[in-house]
Amino acid sequence: MIELRNLSYTYGTAEEPSLKNINLKVKKGELLLVTGHSAAGKTTLALAMAGILHHEIGGKIEGNLSFKNRDIKEFDGIKELSRHTGMVFDDAESQLIFTTVEEEILSGLENRGYSGKEIQRRLNEVMELCEIGHLKERAPHTLSGGQKQKVALAATLALDTEVLILDEATAELDTEAVRKVFSVLKRLKEAEKTIIIVDHNIEDFLEIGDRVVLLEKGEIKAIKSPADFAAVSEDTDLTSKSSKKEYSCSQKERQPVISIKNLTQRYGEFNALDNLDLEIRSGELVAILGENGSGKTTLVKHLNGLLRPYSGNVSVKGLNTSLTPVNELVKHTGLVFQNPDNMLFEDTVEAEVAFGLNNIGITGSEAGDAIARSLELVNLKGKEKVFPRHLSRGERQRLAVACVIAMRPELIILDEPTTGLDAEESDRMMQLMKRLQLEGHTILMVTHNMQIVKDHAERVIRMASGKIVEDSANGACNSFKRNIKCVEEKCAEGGAIV
C-alpha cells in the first residue's frame, strides 16, 4: 500500500534531517503503530505517508515514497491523495475551520459529490460513532480539546478512505472515548482498512496492532510485533523510571489562593459551568479530572482573566478577576494552554520566553537569566534560536511551560501538561512541578493521565456537566487514597472516569 525507500527529509530552514534513510512497507489492511520519544520524527513520518511533505510543506526530500505502486509525486496534490488517505493531526484544532460541528463534517462529504441521502447517512453514522450528536450546532472553537479531537476524527471517518493516519489523535480523549476509538478502529481493520497510529502511548492499541515501529532521532530503531514490544517496554527508555509518590497525611495550615463562589459560565444556551464553588489553598498540587466537555478548561480560564464569569465570583490572591486587568492577573497566575500552539507566535524559542517577561517589566540581564533557567528546566537548552514551529509537539509543550515558569507566578495551571510527551518526559515534567511546589508554587493540572494523578496529585477534583462531583479536599488523607483506588477500579470496569 505504502512504501518508503531510503527516505530522508529535512525541513526548509532546519540544519538536521528529521527523517534519515527510512525503509518501510505498509501492507493493505495492516494496523501499524509508530512510537518514539518527542522529536523522534513520528509526525514527520506521518506527514510523509499522507503526501503532505511532498505536496504541501516542501523541504529537502531524498529517496522514494510510493502509494499503491505509484510515486507520490505523480499524484495531483493533496486533492487526489485525500480521496485515498485521511489524516487526523496532532493539533485537531488546525483542521476545524467552519462555524458549526455539522458543517465541519458536511464540507468534506459535499466536496466528494455524494448524494444528499448518502451525506446524511454518513453524517449520522459518524456523529453516533464519535458521540458528538449533542454538539451538532456548536461552534468548534467553543469545544474542549477532547471534543475537537472527536470532531476531527468524525470528519475524517466520514470520508471512508482506504488509509487512515492518526497522529496523537486520542491524546486529549477521556478513557471511555479512547475505548470507543479502539472499537471503531477494530471494526475498520476487519473491513481491511489500512491504519497508521502515531503516538507516544500505544499501549491502548497493542491488542489490534500488527507491527510496532520505534523511531529514534529520525531513524527506525526497531520494528517489533506488539507482543514483543509489550514484553520489553518496561526495560526500554520509553518507560518512566520514577517511583510513586508517598501520600502525606499531614498538612500545614495553608491560606486560600483561589476562591470561587457560585460560578456559572454559558456558551449561548449551554451552561459550561453551573453554580460552581471551589477553594484552592497555597502550595497544593491539585488534579482536575472529568470527561471531555465537563468544564475543566472553562474553569481554569477564569483564573487568569481569559474568561469572565457569566455570574458568580472568582478571586485569585484576593483579586476579583472580573475587575482586575489581565496584565495584573498574569503576575500571579500562569496558564499553559491545552494546545501549546495557541501560545507560540515569536520567531525564536528565546523570544517566546522573553515576551511574557517583558510584559511584566522584566528585561535585560534579569530576563536573560530567567530565560536560561526556564529553558534548562524543560530540557530545551541549546534551542534558543530555533523557530518554535520547527519543534516537535512535545518540545512545543515544554516551551509553553518554560514561558510560564520564567515569570515565576505563584499559581501555575497546566491544561493537559503531558499531551505530546512520552512517559519519561511526562515524569520529568511532573518532577519539575513537584520542585516548583516545594518552592512555594500552587499547581493545578487538568489531565486525563491517571498515572500522573496517582503518582503526584495531593488532591483530586472530578467534574461532570459543569459541576464538581468529587473532591478529596480538607486534608482527608485516607479519603484521598480511597478516591484514587475508586477511580482506578472504575477505569478497570470501563466507566467513564476521566
From Swiss-Prot:
Q: Which SUPFAM superfamilies match?
A: P-loop containing nucleoside triphosphate hydrolases
**Which residues of this UniProt protein bind ATP 1?**
36-43
Top-level taxon in the UniProt lineage:
Archaea
Q: Taking every annotated instance into account, which residue ranges of this chain make up the domain ABC transporter?
A: 2-242, 258-490
How the protein sits in the membrane?
A: Peripheral membrane protein
EC number(s) stated in the UniProt entry for this protein: 7.-.-.-
Keyword annotations of the record: ATP-binding, Cell membrane, Membrane, Nucleotide-binding, Repeat, Translocase, Transport
In UniProt terms, what function does this protein have? Answer: Probably part of an ABC transporter complex. Responsible for energy coupling to the transport system.
Which family does the record claim for this protein? Belongs to the ABC transporter superfamily.
**What is the designated name of this protein?**
Putative ABC transporter ATP-binding protein MM_2387
